[in-house]
Regions:
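Short phosphate-engaging motifs
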Residues: 29, 39, 158, 190, ...
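Flexible "cap/lid" subdomain of the alpha/beta-hydrolase fold that forms the substrate-access gate
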Residues: 2-11, 19, 42, 57, ...
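A conserved catalytic-core segment of Leloir-type glycosyltransferases
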Residues: 2, 26, 261
Length: 287
């Protein structure tokens, strides 16, 4: 996997647990936030394509990737935002361009709402940072007590389904790439973060993270004046065009690339197109 992910590992300690991140290149900061069930591996091609001109920082959320996977941990959106806040503080990051995917949207925009002065540009990949009732049946099943634990932790169903379905250009999901995505989630204990993310989706007002997401949603409009780019996989069975239209309503001036032949893992499907799009976007919107 070193050939696919040729980066130096860094870690900071958070409450005695290891919080892993990569920090490649120099220049303006690009902070790349993954979702579930991926890890910083998802951004490897973007990092390789952009680190010559930019500083690319990509953490693994606690319970994911190369970060520790404690079994008794507060795996909530608020905690993930706290962890990101600690990393940004440790690295003294400012003038940040946020690149977010999946759960990375809620985590990243949650951080942005807390520290709007630190955020200068936004790049969105098939994500949400607002409340929605739209959730596929298979995701609902994974939230059923008992069943979700057996399916996600026992059989690794969530991560296996993702490598099978989230990338539409099947030639991209080689044995090596597939192994890279699955490597951190190789046993029951190491799948704790994957399950907790699914359980933390706020589907009702009494959900733990409901008020957190509601607050983020209510504060998104303050970023309307920022440059925003959206690259959206049109064949995503979770974050479909309903979510894209919601983002366009919030950020009507956003530069949108709807990638017709890409799925949920839009960066995996279309990184050769996305890298020059990001480069052009950054150059046209200087700090």
């Amino acid at each position: 996997m070193k050939d696919l992910y040729p980066f130096t590992s860094h870690a900071m300690e958070l409450d005695s647990y290891k919080y892993h991140f990569i920090d490649e290149g120099q220049g303006e900061t690009l902070l790349m936030l993954h979702g579930n069930p991926t890890w910083s591996f998802y951004y490897r091609n973007l990092v390789l394509g952009l680190k010559q001109s930019y500083r690319c920082v990509a953490p693994d959320h606690m319970g994911m990737g190369k970060s520790d996977k404690p079994q008794n941990y507060n795996y909530t959106l608020s905690q993930h935002i706290d962890n990101l806040e600690a990393l940004v503080d440790k690295l003294s990051l400012s003038d940040i361009t946020l690149l977010v995917h999946d759960w990375g949207g809620a985590i990243g925009m949650g951080f942005a709402v807390r520290h709007p002065q630190k955020i200068k540009r936004l790049v969105l990949f098939n994500t949400a940072a607002f409340l929605s009732k739209k959730i596929p049946v298979r995701l609902k099943l994974c939230r059923v007590p008992g069943f979700g634990d057996i399916a996600i932790r026992g059989f690794n169903a969530f991560a296996l389904a993702a490598v099978g379905m989230a990338c539409k250009n099947k030639e991209r999901m080689t044995d090596e790439v597939r192994a890279g995505y699955l490597a951190p989630y190789n046993n029951y204990a190491n799948r704790i973060g994957t399950l907790r993310f699914v359980q933390d989706i706020p589907m009702s007002s009494d959900a733990l993270s409901y008020s957190v997401v509601k607050n983020i949603e209510e504060n998104l409009e303050q970023f309307k004046s920022l440059p925003v780019m959206i690259a959206w996989g049109a064949k995503d069975f979770v974050f479909n065009d309903h979510f894209l239209k919601k983002w366009q309503g919030i950020f009507p001036e956003a530069k949108v690339h709807r990638v017709q032949d890409a799925g949920h893992y839009v960066v995996e499907d279309a990184y050769e197109r996305i890298i020059p799009w990001v480069q052009e976007f950054l150059q046209k919107n200087p700090l």
